[in-house]
Structures are given as C-alpha cells and as structure tokens.
Amino acid sequence: MHIKVTELVGESSAGWKDAVQSAVTEASRNINEIVGVEVVNFTAHVENGRIVGYKANLKMAHKQ
C-alpha cells in the first residue's frame, strides 16, 4: 500500500475545527481514501481587534 501526503489549507469564519473539516470535505471531493490528517498550524485573520477568519494548515495522508 502506498500513502501519499498532500498539504492544504482550510478556512472558516466559525472556528479552527470548521477550518479543518472544510479542508477535508473539499479534498474528499477529488481524493479517495483519506486515512489521516496532521494539523501543522493554525492562523487567524483579525480586524478591529476581533478574529474574523480561521485557517488550518494540514498534511493529509491518503491511499494512492
């Protein structure tokens, strides 16, 4: 079995968990058999002292 790792970014206005899920949902439209996700880091976009956007950088493992 061969495993490939793909790096991607998920975004959400609701939170980091939703940002991760957004990335997995979007990737699963084109990538079959996702077997795991490593969150590399989280970042946020801030406006007027408030977080308005969340980003999660991921490494996704999937079967090839």
Task: Pin down the residues of each PLM region.
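Short, well-ordered alpha-helical segments
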Residues: 2-35
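A cross-kingdom feature marking charged/low-complexity
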Residues: 38, 42-64
